[in-house]
Structure formats: C-alpha cells, structure tokens
C-alpha cells in the first residue's frame, strides 16, 4: 500500500446513495499544503466548485471532503450554504480553519444535499483517519464507475517523494474535463506557482485528451496538494527536479485518465487515437479529437468493424489541413489506408482481428508535416444507453 507522508484518509456511508455504499470521503494533511486546481469549463457550475475554486486560488489547503450520490448543482443559494456547512463541519472535526477545506460533490443534478445525514456523519469522520485508506476514499467517490481508480509514482533515491492520486469518472467524460474528480497528494515541497503550472500541463496531457461521451459536467475538479512532509528541497520551475516532478505528475494523471476511459459507461474497448504528420500540433489534435468523438467511429469499434471509411470521414470534417492522397491509417500497425486508398480485404481482415482486443491503437498519418496529437476514447455500446436511461431510477 502506497503511503504519502502526512496524508490520511477515511470514508463513510452517510446514506446519500440508495445502495448504502460509502458515499463520503475525507482526505487530510497534518499540515497545510500548497495547492493547485483545475475546474470545469461548464458555465453552469455546482456549488462545491464555486466554494472550492477561490479557496484553492488562495494557495493553501489541508483537507478535501467529497460526496457521491448528489452533485449539489443547480441548487441555488441553499446549495451554496450546504456546501459551506459541509466544509465547516469537516473543519471543526479536524480542528482547522474552514478556508483550508475543499468540498466536492458528484451525482444527480438538481437535488439539495440531504443535510441531516451529513450533519450526523461528517463530525465523526476524523476519528477513522488512516494512512492506508486511500482506496476507501476512491470507492466513496464512485457513481457509475465499476472500479476504484488509484495511481502513484515515486521519485528517485536522491530526494525521494511520492505522488498519489485518486479519481472518479465513467460517463460525462470529455476534454476540458467532465464528470470527473481527481485529487492528488504529494509529500514533495513544491513552489506554489510552479505547482499550478505543472498541474495545468499535466491535465492538458491527460484528462483533456480523453473522451467517453462528449458531455462536460458541472462539477469537475482536479486538485493537487503538496505538503512538503518528505522534507526534500523545494522543487521550482526551470530545473531538473521540476521537470521530473512534472513528468511524474502527468504519469499519475494519465494513468487515472486511461482508467476512466477503460471504465467508460458500458465500454468494452480502450482506444488510443494517434495522429502524426499533421501541418502542426493544433491540426493533429483537431483530427484526433474528431475521430475520438465520432459516434459512428465509436460504434464501429464496439462492432469490431475495421470501418476505416468512418475514420477518414472524421479526418475530413476536422477542419485541419488535409490532402486525401497522403492519408494513411493503421490499426495497431496494420495498414488499412495508404495514400488515401484502402489496402484491400486481406489487411482489413487483419485489422478486424485487432479490434477484437480490449485495447488497441488507431494511427493516422496525414503526410504533411511534423504535427502530432493524441486522444484516448472508448467504444459506444448498448450498455451505455441502458446505464444513462436508468440513471435516476
């Protein structure tokens, strides 16, 4: 079990979820931690986002309280007061300033939090804090997720520290984040401004290159807390240590991001869409985005149909610079298109075998330049429709 110096965790069932499963998680640092955050781009933002964003912007955080089963979104002033009250209850239990508590929620939109249940449960949570209970918090965050999502990285021997992250998400997953929460804890000592910079870059190369269903939630947030309890020297920008930290942080977030796509509601495939040879990186990303989000492409993945026509059509409407006569498409290295033309039934049959795998790559070479881009996506299945048709019942 991975531990991070100075961090402890606890989860409880407050009764928000009908199933009776844990629905309330608490992350605590023994000392105030430097922090950074990235939040939903949705213009309709849930109360916990509105409460937490300015607290994170202040630069210090000591605890994160998260509930599942209720988003506390579109709940008006009552929702704001409820979010504030939850933070107050956690702060009092922990003996810290309420401004150091981040609050987060995920679940059904439009219903007020069941405050009597939370008033009863939150005050006693601090008594159960444990250095090894991170999996419990990851489980308490889940809604339609089928498994808990935890990832970690450790720095080298010269100045050792640990980065540990948890996440939830399976539906409403789309670039610029979606119904997706992630909390990252590290005992490294990191300059606060660099921490925000490193987080934004890591999110750009992880959570912002995944898609399940093109929906973006009201509640997304990614937070990182760095408490310095490893007692290693401060990590700053433009240094070898800073580069290592940024790479490790992205590694944790990318692991979590791929778990989210793998757990996409009803998903049976994890597909890595890679675009090479674009005029520039922006064009490459446009192409990867359009292929990864095409419902026709995603249903072909589910049907294990190497239907490259749907892919090349998505390339064509991406608004990227394209010369059809230069396009090549590969499934795990099997060429199905060369110079804009199909390579024939034998290679297409090999590509169909590739699509029977749970994970594979689709590589598109535009043959125009050095631009590169990527996305991770899932297939689109009957089960996705069923899960979301029944979500509130």
Curated annotation (Swiss-Prot):
Pfam families noted in UniProt: ArgJ (PF01960)
Pathway: Amino-acid biosynthesis; L-arginine biosynthesis; L-ornithine and N-acetyl-L-glutamate from L-glutamate and N(2)-acetyl-L-ornithine (cyclic): step 1/1; Amino-acid biosynthesis; L-arginine biosynthesis; N(2)-acetyl-L-ornithine from L-glutamate: step 1/4
Family annotation (PANTHER family): ARGININE BIOSYNTHESIS BIFUNCTIONAL PROTEIN ARGJ, ARGININE BIOSYNTHESIS BIFUNCTIONAL PROTEIN ARGJ, MITOCHONDRIAL
Site (Involved in the stabilization of negative charge on the oxyanion by the formation of the oxyanion hole): 106-107
Active site (catalytic residues): 179
Chief location category: cytoplasm
Listed GO CC annotations: cytoplasm
Domain of life the protein comes from: Bacteria
Subunit structure, as described in the record: Heterotetramer of two alpha and two beta chains.
GO biological process: L-arginine biosynthetic process; ornithine biosynthetic process
Provenance organism: Syntrophotalea carbinolica (strain DSM 2380 / NBRC 103641 / GraBd1) (Pelobacter carbinolicus)
Compartment list: Cytoplasm
Name the record gives this protein: Arginine biosynthesis bifunctional protein ArgJ
Primary role: Catalyzes two activities which are involved in the cyclic version of arginine biosynthesis: the synthesis of N-acetylglutamate from glutamate and acetyl-CoA as the acetyl donor, and of ornithine by transacetylation between N(2)-acetylornithine and glutamate.
Annotated family: Belongs to the ArgJ family.
EC number: 2.3.1.35, 2.3.1.1
Residues that hold substrate according to the record: 143, 168, 179, 265, 388, 393
Alphabetized UniProt keyword annotations: Acyltransferase, Amino-acid biosynthesis, Arginine biosynthesis, Autocatalytic cleavage, Cytoplasm, Multifunctional enzyme, Transferase
Catalytic reactions on record: N(2)-acetyl-L-ornithine + L-glutamate = N-acetyl-L-glutamate + L-ornithine; L-glutamate + acetyl-CoA = N-acetyl-L-glutamate + CoA + H(+)
């Amino acid at each position: 079990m991975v531990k991070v110096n100075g961090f402890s965790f606890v989860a409880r069932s407050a009764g928000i979820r009908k199933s009776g499963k844990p629905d309330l998680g608490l992350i605590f640092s023994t000392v105030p931690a430097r922090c950074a955050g990235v939040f939903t781009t949705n213009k309709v933002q849930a109360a916990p986002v509105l409460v937490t964003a300015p607290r994170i912007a202040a630069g210090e955080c000591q605890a994160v309280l998260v509930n599942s089963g209720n988003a506390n979104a579109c709940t008006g002033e009552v929702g704001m007061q409820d979010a504030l009250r939850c933070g107050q209850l956690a702060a009092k239990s922990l003996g810290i300033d309420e401004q150091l508590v981040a609050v987060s929620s995920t679940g059904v939109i439009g219903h007020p939090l069941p405050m009597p249940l939370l008033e009863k449960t939150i005050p006693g949570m601090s008594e159960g804090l444990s250095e090894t209970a991170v999996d419990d918090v990851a489980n308490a965050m889940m809604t339609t997720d089928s498994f808990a999502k935890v990832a970690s990285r450790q720095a080298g021997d010269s100045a050792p520290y640990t980065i540990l992250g948890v996440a939830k998400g399976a539906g409403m997953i789309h670039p610029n984040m979606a119904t997706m929460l992630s909390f990252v804890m590290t005992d490294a000592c990191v300059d606060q401004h660099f921490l925000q910079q490193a987080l934004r870059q890591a999110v750009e190369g992880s959570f912002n290159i995944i898609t399940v269903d093109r929906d973006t939630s009201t509640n997304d947030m990614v937070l990182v807390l760095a408490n310095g309890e490893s007692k290693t020297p401060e990590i700053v920008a433009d240094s070898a240590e800073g580069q290592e930290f940024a790479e490790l942080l992205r590694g944790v977030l990318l692991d979590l991001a791929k778990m989210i796509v793998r757990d996409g509601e009803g998903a049976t495939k994890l597909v890595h869409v890679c675009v090479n040879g674009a005029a520039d990186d922006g064009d490459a990303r446009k192409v990867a985005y359009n292929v990864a989000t095409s419902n026709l492409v995603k249903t072909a993945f589910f049907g294990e149909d190497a239907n490259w026509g749907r892919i090349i059509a998505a390339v064509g409407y991406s608004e990227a610079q394209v010369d059809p006569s230069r396009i090549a498409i590969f499934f795990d290295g099997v060429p199905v298109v060369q110079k804009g033309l199909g390579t024939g039934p034998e290679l297409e049959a090999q590509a169909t075998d590739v699509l029977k795998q749970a994970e594979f790559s689709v590589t598109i070479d535009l043959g125009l330049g050095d631009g590169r881009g990527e996305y991770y996506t899932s297939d689109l299945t009957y089960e996705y429709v069923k899960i979301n048709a029944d979500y509130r019942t």
